[in-house]
């Protein structure tokens, strides 16, 4: 039986490129090499595409994907050269220029099927402010928030925040993930500093009400038929689950399934599916919730390309549901091909 080519895109231009490499290395090891051969392409911080490695069998434990320190400039290619007939692309890219619709539009232009959400849902879900506004209309509960857009009246935005919210608040770039650029502010001075930091990453800033809550996550899989997982909980040894805690210090553990009442679990799964559909999602996503001591549920964000390492929440949630990492990848490829065929059929 001939194998299908699975193209892994990794690295990328965003501040989350290191997470992308970790995720891609996990995927390359988990792939069923009876069904796939894998070709990998590294995207540099400057946006160059580098042809890196090919695998026809499971790589050894010491095999690493080539990155900035090991890629060869002579292997740079035109981005369109990744095209291969009957291949499927897995864009294991996080953050801007990865899960914001940019790469998805590029792949659709090349007529390549790909894993994950489409152009519209990727771009909308990447922007925390747009997500908030759409989910408000959909009736999905969220914490109170204000917005600052660079070029608008900063003093007015600070005044609105002081009027509508209470400290602590969290200040977030609208279009970053993995907690990059996010700060907790306990007073007005810290709020202003947090806005300055967030502006280094984005011109659109979200300011959210801080809540004392457990962080619960639900996995989503599907296109027109949407499946969800039992929730898992992020258990932190730090006050704030930032990039350092997530990926460098490993100061978190995961409780899967989360120890929550059945009715809370059911409601979270329903909200996750509702949010996914409201944003036009397809393929996969991870929906992150806050659960307060008094039982209030707030949707925090919907991540269209969640961390995909072997220790990441998303694949572990599906493993708990009986779907192995390897079979999850197969299912995602099938869903990606299904959406490609549907897009092509609509071009009449």
Curated annotation (Swiss-Prot):
Binding site residues for Mg(2+) 2: 301, 303
Cofactor(s) this protein cannot do without: Mg(2+); Mn(2+)
Associated pathway: Cell wall biogenesis; peptidoglycan biosynthesis
Localisation: Cytoplasm
Binding annotation for ATP: 162-217
GO cellular component entries: cytosol
PROSITE patterns per UniProt: ATP_GRASP, DALA_DALA_LIGASE_1, DALA_DALA_LIGASE_2
Record's cofactor remark: Binds 2 magnesium or manganese ions per subunit.
Catalytic activity annotation: 2 D-alanine + ATP = D-alanyl-D-alanine + ADP + phosphate + H(+)
Binding site residues for Mg(2+) 1: 288, 301
GO molecular function: ATP binding; D-alanine-D-alanine ligase activity; metal ion binding
A Pfam family annotated for this UniProt entry: Dala_Dala_lig_N
Domain ATP-grasp stretches: 132-334
Keywords noted in UniProt: ATP-binding, Cell shape, Cell wall biogenesis/degradation, Cytoplasm, Ligase, Magnesium, Manganese, Metal-binding, Nucleotide-binding, Peptidoglycan synthesis
Similarity comment: Belongs to the D-alanine--D-alanine ligase family.
PANTHER family per the UniProt record, alphabetical: D-ALANINE--D-ALANINE LIGASE (PTHR23132), D-ALANINE--D-ALANINE LIGASE A (PTHR23132:SF25)
Identification of the protein by name: D-alanine--D-alanine ligase
Organism of this sequence: Streptococcus thermophilus (strain ATCC BAA-250 / LMG 18311)
